Amino acid sequence: MDDLDYKILSLISNDARISFLEVSRICNVSGAAVHQRVQKMMANEIITGSEFWLNLKKIGYQTCAFLFLHFSETTNLDRIVEKLKDIREIVECHSITGEYDIFVKIYALNNSHLYEIIQNQIKPLGVVRTETLMSYKESFHRQFVFG
């Protein structure tokens, strides 16, 4: 990674819709050079995708919660994580230190829906203890931005 790569990252992380042509003009290099560098960063998994973020409240998902999960059998956490991936309402999953094993961010239609997901999909995976924190307001949401 050199200064040009970091400048390209800064531009595209600030605006995923910016064209390679615009990036090339700002960086004073050819569009092909920008394309090659972005492709190389994708191949090296520095860039892992581009996406649109949904406003889930606008499509009915009124509850956002953070769950701390402790499992009876921690030797199978990789298998558990694979099963958590199948729960579409879970949007983040982290293996953590401390008294819990896994931390997830989850969206649900409402509190009853959240309860159903926890009881019917998460607890059967071997959860012995949970702690749930409810978000009452998202103050900001962003991608890490260079520059």
Give residue ranges: language-model regions.
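A compositional/biophysical signature of low hydrophobicity enriched in polar/charged and small residues
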Residues: M1-G147
